[in-house]
């Protein structure tokens, strides 16, 4: 039987590449930076332009499909995930990197049907790396099959996380305390690339063993989550329970052993869900 969503995935790859070209061209120029929820939650005209370009192109081809887009939500639309085929889009994951020309920025597209992710596309455009995964078909980077690492010993692991965009003292205290706890186990190291999608793709490649973060949004992880699982990894909630796309928290790891150990060590930050008003 033909794959009903393969055409959508092929189109997503084409659009991500086109969007990446726009982003890479714009990164060379001076940009007008605006603020969203805080002085460090940044948005540029390119974020907005790329999202509009992606959504209008998809709407034209698939008029019955739904959308959740980072900049649409910032403009007042709701993050409601229904059973309808839904494109979950982050036009520039790593906007702060983009503003500073730090070369890790990604176009991220996740596609859900019946609230389950069917495929993910993450284009790390400055690097020229196209990460893709289709449910049940494996994960790839530029056509090369991906496989997570086999490391089960946390003391020999390399972790990835982010400090996040919150500057609330209590949140910052928990973020730093969690890093300190993990760092002193000890782990081999903790890295931050500045984009959740690329961090997760690094777990899929085996370059990092696990990634965790609280405060991310569904559009940060919808594309990359399936890339991790199709490369043999696991997604988990930071409490150790099942991963929930709308919960704003995630552990993406090479295996359950590392994921559960990280969940055991970290304090949970209370957050409003993406699908709450």
Swiss-Prot record:
It is found in: Cytoplasm. Its main location: cytoplasm. GO terms for molecular function: fructose-1-phosphatase activity; glucose-1-phosphatase activity; glucose-6-phosphatase activity; glycerol-2-phosphatase activity; inositol monophosphate 1-phosphatase activity; inositol monophosphate 3-phosphatase activity; inositol monophosphate 4-phosphatase activity; inositol monophosphate phosphatase activity. Its EC number is 3.1.3.25, 3.1.3.94. PROSITE patterns: IMP_1, IMP_2. It comes from the Eukaryota. Mg(2+) 1 binds at residues 70, 90, 92. Inhibited by Li(+), Ca(2+) and Mn(2+), but also by Mg(2+) at concentrations above 3 mM. Its cofactor is Mg(2+). Mg(2+) 2 binds at residues 90, 93, 220. CDD domains: IMPase (cd01639). This is Inositol monophosphatase 1. It comes from Pongo abelii (Sumatran orangutan).
